[in-house]
Amino acid sequence: LVTQTDHVGSGWNPVSTPSLWSAGGTCNGGTTPTPTPTPTPTPTPTPTPTPTPTPTPTPTPTPTPTPTPTPIPTPTPTPTPTGLAKHALIGYWHNFTNPSGATYPISQVSDDWDVIVVSFGDNAGGGNVSLTIDPGAGTEAQFIADVAAKRAKGKKVILSLGGQNGSVSVGSTAEATNFTNSLYAIITKYGFDGIDLDLENGVAQGAAIQTYLPIAVKNLKAKVGSSFYLSMAPEWVYVEGGYTSYGSIWGAYIPIINALRSELTVLHPQYYNNGDIYTPYATGAIKAGSADQLVATARMLIEGFNYGGNTFAGLRPDQVGFGVPSGRSSAGSGFTTNADVSNALNCLTRLLNCGTIKPLQAYPDFRGVMTWSINWDRHDGYNFSVPTKTVLKTLP
């Protein structure tokens, strides 16, 4: 996924760094377009760190939002129990050294984290994925044992694909097959619960990956079984951005999400490094990092929204979370205070502490919070994970 992660030798800062993955960019800052009938965005890639790279879109129009009826949530089947915490704290663990510090063993990750996202798998070409464990994580045998120990405690440990400079081609039947088989081998070897899709490079309207990635993931789940964990962490431009302007990268993840609704465990877009956002609930852009932004975007994913003449049907509340930076060092923009995280969670689950925007109803099954990153949080003295976990424990 694009903005999310820095690679070896870089800080999760607005610094471009070569990595094992091919070209990546970061959709940061910049003026977010207002919805118009015929937008023509022109993304301008500008690498910046965060749970993924992102091209910086520069749409031409200066749209004016037109009020539209809020789609009513579509009833969805009851989720199958997964063993995942009802309200989860999800974080990315660095399989590389950067200014947050050297890689350290998974065994040293605080048990406050419910989902540990290993960052990242490598592009081995032709749709294949590989994984090389950083020496700082210990021997391969130790890494495997550490993953098993975390899972024995009820934690989920998954492999993320993408990152700030990450890309993998899944543009044909052959590449989809390689993607499935190589990841199944990795999951089996290391004991991962599943994967996280942080792939944005090459994801655009009409791109072959929109067709073949869902096929590959469905086949992977068929091999792994019903316990397969699938998360996605695209920048909001690729999802809710479709409301503003549906074309190019704007809303480009929507077809992938729609194709994988039955397989999806949780969608937690990145709400940092991308600027302010337009939603159906306000005439102007909502400030990045604010509680209103977190509530509004979660509301869009749960209650649905219009895009390109279509309607995005809401996901189950337990399939939705929000992604924020763990501190001011881990992202270039979009920092969220602990108070805003707490207010957003309480508003979404109990209709308490809401600001200007509130959901149509309380969603007590709202999944939780994703952050970039576990390593930066430890570097900063657990200033994010401890208070956020405390709030998550109080939710209904």
Feature names for model-found ranges:
Residues 1-36:
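Tryptophan-rich substrate-binding surfaces of secreted polymer-degrading and adhesive proteins
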Residues 16-18, 23-28, 44, 66, ...:
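Mixed-charge, low-complexity intrinsically disordered regions
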Residues 373:
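Residues that scaffold, gate, or flank divalent-cation-dependent active/transport sites
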Residues 25-28, 387-395:
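Short, low-complexity, Pro/Ser/Thr/Gly-rich segments in the mature regions of secreted, periplasmic
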Residues 81-301, 317-321, 326-343, 363-366, ...:
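Chitinase-like catalytic core of GlcNAc-active glycosidases
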Residues 298-312, 341-362:
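A short, acidic, amphipathic alpha-helical segment used as a generic capping/interface helix at domain edges
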Residues 30-113, 121, 394-396:
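N-terminal module-boundary/linker segments of secreted carbohydrate-active enzymes
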